[in-house]
Amino acid sequence: MLMKAHDSKFYRWLFSTPYRALHRAYEASKKVRNIQRDYLFYKNAVGDSSKRSFYNVTLYIDSILNQSASNIFWSLLEFKISINLCNFIVSLRDPHIDNEKSDFIFESFNKSTKENLENLVDLQKDKNLLSNERKNVISLNSYTRSFKQKIGNYINLLIGWKPKNEVNYLTENLSFTSSIEENCFFLKKFYNKTLDWERWNRKLTWIEAVLIDLELLKNKGWFSSEALSEQRNPQPFPNFNTSYKTVSLSGPFVERSKKMQKIGSRSKLNQNFSPYIDPGAGTYGSTTKEGSSGANSRKGNPFGRSVRGTEKVKDTAYESLGLVPRSITRTLSRFQTELAGRSASLVLPEFRLAKYQAITSIKYLAFLIFCPWLVLTVCKILFLEPLIENWWNTAQFQIFLSFSQEEKALKRLQQVEELLWLDIIMADSSAKQPQDLSAQIHQRTIDLVETYNQESIQTILHFFTNFLFIFVVISLLIWGKKRLAILNSWVQEVFYSLSDTMKAFFILLFTDLCIGFHSPHGWEILIGFILEHLGFSHNKHVISCFVSTFPVILDTVFKYWIFRHLNRISPSIVVSYHTMNE
C-alpha cells in the first residue's frame, strides 16, 4: 500500500507540473509589468525636478527584466517538456482502446469525469459495498501486469473511461492510492485544471505580450523614437495558432482536450491585454483613451525626459555639478514632496534602489579582486610556469638576468667561503680538511646556482603574470563599465552620507599616508619592492627621483580637488579638515 500511495503522489505531481510551470511564467510576466508600473508611479511622484540616480534606476530595471525573462524562459521550457511527457503517458493507456474510441473518450471528457466522480462519492458513502467488491478482486501483490498497463489503467480512470466490469475496474485502480478521498480530491483538481483551457490561453497570451515587450525594449531600447512610436501605436497580435514558437501545445493530452472548448476570439483577447508596454498609459496593462492622453502628455517618454530622434542618454553614475549645489536641489525637491504628501510612496523605490546599488557594488568589487587572482593562478600553474621553466633551462645558458643578481650571488658565495674557513680555523687541524673544504664550497656553489636560476624563472614569470593581470583588470573594467559606474556612485553616496567629522578624519588619514611627513620612507620601500618584483635592479637615483616628485604631484591634485569639488559640495567638510589639520 505504501508503494501505491507513492505512485499516486507521483502521478499527481507529474500531471500538475504543466500548471505549476505556466503559473511561474505567468507570475514572472506580471513582475515585469509591476516593476515598470512601480517605476512610473515613482517618476510621477518625484517629478522632473528631481535628478535622483537616473542611470542606476535604469540599471536596476534592466537587472529585474533580465531575471524575469530568464524565469519565463525556463518555466516555459518546463511547461513544454511536461506537456510532452503527459502526452506520452496518455498514449500509454490501455492498448485495447482504438483511436476512434479514444477520440470519443476525450470528446466526452466532461461528462465521463463527472460520472466518475459521482461513482467515487457513491463508493465512498457505501463502504460495505466497496469492501464486498474488494473481496472479489485479486490483490495487487498476486496480480502482475506490465508497467504500461498500470499507467494506462490509471489514466483511463482519470479520463473517465471504464470497461464493462465497472466496479471491479474502479476498485482495482483505487489500489494505486492510499484512500478514496485522495482520488476524489485529485480527480476534482485534475478535472478543474484540465478543462480550463480558456485560462491557459489567456495566460499564454499575457506571457506572449510580455515577451514581445521585452524583445522590443532589448532591440530598440527605452529611448529610441521608433520604440516609442510603436508603444504609442501598438500593432495587433499575430494569430494565436501560429504565434507560439517557444511553446507548442500538441499531443493527445492537449489536442483532444481542445475539442471540448473553443479558444476565445482574438478580438476578445485584444480587449483584455495590451500588446506592448505603454509606460504613459493611465490604466496599466490596457490601451485606454486616458492612457493615450497620458502618453501624449509626456510625449511617450517613460522617464519623463525629452527624446530627440535616437539621442542616447548620457551615461553618468551621479548628477553633474551645476551653478546650484546638488544638496540645495535635493532639499527643495524633498521639501516639495513632503508638502504634497507623497513621501510614503518614495520609501520603497528608494530602498530597492539602495539595496540594488549596494549588492551590485559589493559583488563587482569582490569580482574585481578574486577573478584576476583566479585567472592568474590557473594560467600560472597550467601554462606559464611549465613553459617558461622549460624554455629557460633548455634554450638559455645564462643564470642571471641582471648585474644586481650577479653581485648578490657573489656576495653570498664569499660569505659561505668565509664561514667555512672560520669553521676550519676553530676546529682541529687535519690533512683532509682542504679536500673537504673544496667539496663543501662546490656543493654550496651548486645550491646557489639552483637558487638564483629559480629566482630568474620566477622573475620572468612575474613579468608575464603582471601583464596578464593588467589585461584581465582592464578587460573587466571595460566589460563592467555600468557596474563600475554603480560602484563609483555607491562609494560617493556612502562617503557623503557620513558626518562632516568622519569625512575630515578619512581625508586626513589618506593624505598623511600618501603625502605626510613620514610618507617618503614608505614610498621608497614600495618602489623598491616593485622594482625587485619586476626584475629590475635596485637604483637609488630612480627611487629618490620618484619620491621627490610623485608625492608633490599627488598633493597638488588633492588640494585642487578640495578647492574645486569639495568646497562646493560641502564647505563644512573643508572647514573641519583645516581645523583638524591645524
From Swiss-Prot:
Entry's Gene Ontology BP terms: potassium ion transport
Keyword field: Antiport, Chloroplast, Hydrogen ion transport, Ion transport, Membrane, Plastid, Plastid inner membrane, Potassium, Potassium transport, Transmembrane, Transmembrane helix, Transport
GO CC term (a single one): chloroplast inner membrane
Highest taxon, organism lineage: Eukaryota
Composition bias type Polar residues, residue spans: 284-299
Positions of region (Disordered): 284-307
InterPro entries in the cross-refs: CemA
Compartment list: Plastid, Chloroplast inner membrane
Protein topology in the membrane: Multi-pass membrane protein
Molecular function GO labels: antiporter activity; proton transmembrane transporter activity
Chain segments carrying region Insert: 183-316
Catalytic activity: K(+)(in) + H(+)(out) = K(+)(out) + H(+)(in)
Location, primary (coarse class): plastid
Pfam families assigned: CemA (PF03040)
Residue spans crossing the bilayer: 364-384, 460-480, 507-527, 543-563
Protein family (similarity comment): Belongs to the CemA family.
Functional summary from the UniProt entry: Contributes to K(+)/H(+) antiport activity by supporting proton efflux to control proton extrusion and homeostasis in chloroplasts in a light-dependent manner to modulate photosynthesis. Prevents excessive induction of non-photochemical quenching (NPQ) under continuous-light conditions. Indirectly promotes efficient inorganic carbon uptake into chloroplasts.
Name the UniProt record assigns to this protein: Potassium/proton antiporter CemA
Organism expressing this protein natively: Staurastrum punctulatum
